[in-house]
Amino acid sequence: MNEARQSGPYKVLTSKKTDAALAKCVQYEWQNQSIFGGTPGATLQPGRDTGYTVFTEGSQYFVDIQPKGSGAEAKYYVVVGNWIANKRLAAPQGCL
């Protein structure tokens, strides 16, 4: 994950929701998003200093969510850029 962070996010999104609410929504959506007929699951953990990180199995797709102003900022990272990366992006976008 650190290598992906050093390369920069695939997409940066802002939300009026709190960081906790946004993180829980992304986790829920990823846990229920079917890829190849299965659901890969998603894990939510506290961020390094503040906020949260939500990641899929294998950590190929993850989002760092930090409080920003009265809402939150979500930085979406991909390890493998493919059509699944765009499908995974729909979850954080839908949670804004």
What do these predicted regions represent?
Residues 46-80:
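Mid-chain, structured segments of secreted extracytoplasmic proteins
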Residues 37, 50-52, 90-96:
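Surface-exposed, polar/charged interaction patches used for macromolecular assembly or partner binding
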Residues 33-45:
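A short, aromatic/hydrophobic, helix- or strand-capping loop or linear motif
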Residues 19, 23, 27, 62, ...:
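Extracytoplasmic/secreted envelope proteins and their assembly/folding machinery
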Residues 73-96:
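C-terminal partner/receptor-binding element of secreted or periplasmic proteins
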Residues 1-4, 43, 66:
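A generic structural signal for ordered alpha-helices
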Residues 34-35, 65, 84-89:
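A short, polar/proline- and glycine-enriched secondary-structure boundary/capping micro-motif
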Residues 1-36:
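Terminal, regulation- and interaction-focused segments at domain boundaries
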